[in-house]
Design a protein with these regions (language model features):
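Active-site lining segments that contact anionic ligands and/or coordinate catalytic metals
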Residues: 55, 64, 257, 280, ...
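Extracellular beta-strand/beta-solenoid scaffold signature
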Residues: 85-93, 122-126, 131-132, 151-166, ...
């Protein structure tokens, strides 16, 4: 949220509201400014009448309580249908650890038109995957951790964005052939303490935030670099099956969001999905920036098709992992067609596959990518990389993505 703009010659001094201003400028990487190595940190300004210059854009004058809209070609405002969402969550399925909600199936239901007001009211400083910082500090000099982990240059505490459909403390809550469209934040969120659940044949389209979230991304009072391994294993999201879904036009407002983001999860299977037109990575698996063993294990990302990704953000990959995840696999996926936006922090910091800090005991095998641009950053032990790149059997490329019975999702208007 902008507090003031003061023009100074050919420049302008922009000041932001608190607390987000302090939190953002404490953020260690990428720094929100031009750095000494010449890397850029761009700012994207919205909601000013002067910026209303492209058809389809709008401006909300909050003082006058008036909305200005620049019509697209052929649109007539006298005949326009306008949707102004007023609710953040449409459906909430919530039990307790001792009395979970069980065996509910949603089939052929459309979930549409939600909002999310927190960024307008309190600001929004995202860390990653749409998780926003409620507080954060830079650490100088860096804090030494145990021998397994790199020194720590920051600490952060996170909040979780709203979702159109929330599932908490439940078992086997399924979504078959549903549509999640025109949403102001996350589409579907298996938030905490959920066992089982199938998401199959669903369309996720035109969503401001993440398409689908699974599992904890650090509880609110838990510093985000600490491993999460609750004594009561019922708190962990496990055994979700996400397959044959189509994700497109995700993260339209919050550019650090993904089609599918799974945090501290176990036995999760993500396969035969197609992902396109996303601002950042396609699939993110894991959390924590630590090699320390935690509750994550036995996860599988298999035969997904990811293309036309990274529309706005770098430090990115088609498939991205974090943290120690014994017996986890990234196999037979197809990744191609990355965008090349001109304003990213570092124009070379993009990849097809990316195992980030603490990634351990993960097998990355037989993935078709149009080049061999990968990153293994501050990884732990036990990772296996075998047979990835453009020379992988073309059958892998052909099999990736939606299976025959679900290709109709690509043609839904």
């Amino acid at each position: 949220r902008i507090r003031s703009i003061e023009v100074q010659g050919d420049s302008a001094a922009v000041r932001f509201h608190q607390p987000e201003s302090r939190i953002q400028f404490e953020h260690p990487w990428p720094r929100p400014m031009v750095t000494t190595d010449g890397h850029n940190s761009a700012f994207y300004l919205t909601n000013a009448r002067e910026l209303l210059d492209v058809p389809g854009e709008w401006y909300h004058d909050m003082n006058a309580r008036r909305v200005y809209y620049y019509p697209r070609e052929g649109e007539k405002m006298q005949e326009a249908e306008v949707m102004a969402p007023a609710i953040e969550t449409l459906v909430q399925v919530e039990g307790t650890l001792d009395r979970p909600v069980c065996h509910i199936r949603f089939e052929k239901i459309t979930f549409s038109y939600t909002t999310w007001m927190r960024p307008s009211e309190k600001g929004h400083v995202p860390l990653q995957a749409g998780m926003y910082l409620t507080d954060g500090y830079r650490i100088d000099p860096k804090m030494q951790r145990n021998y397994l982990n790199h020194p720590l240059d920051n600490q952060g505490w996170l909040g979780r964005p709203a979702a159109a459909v929330r599932v908490v403390a439940a078992r086997q809550i399924d979504f078959e052939r549903c549509r999640f469209e025109h949403l102001g934040s996350t589409g579907l969120d298996y938030e905490e303490a959920v066992q089982g659940g199938v998401v199959r044949g669903c369309l996720f389209r035109d969503i401001a935030g993440n398409g689908l979230l699974v599992g904890s991304f650090s509880p609110a009072a838990h510093e985000t670099h600490l491993p999460y391994d609750p004594a009561d294993r019922r708190e962990v999201c496990t055994q979700q099956q996400i397959n044959n879904c189509y994700f497109t036009e995700i993260g339209n407002e919050d550019w650090g969001c993904l089609a599918i983001a799974a945090g501290y999860v176990g036995d999760v299977n993500i396969e035969h999905n197609e992902i396109s037109e996303v601002p950042y990575s396609g699939i993110s698996l894991g959390w924590g920036w630590t090699q320390t063993v935690n509750c994550m294990r036995n996860n599988r990302v298999h035969a997904n098709l990811i293309h036309h990704y990274a529309k706005h953000m770098y430090d990115v990959a088609g498939i991205y992992t974090l943290g120690s995840q014994p017996k986890s696999y990234v196999t037979e996926n197809c990744v191609h067609s990355i965008y090349k936006p001109g304003y990213v922090h570092d124009p070379n910091h993009w990849f097809y596959l990316y195992t980030d800090e603490g990634s351990s005991f993960i097998t990355v095998r037989d993935n078709w990518t149009e080049g061999e641009k990968y990153l293994q950053n501050a990884n732990g032990p036990g990772n296996v990389w075998e047979n990835n790149g453009p020379k992988v059997d073309n059958d892998v490329r052909e099999r990736a993505g939606l299976e025959a019975g679900y290709k109709d999702l690509l043609n839904i208007q």
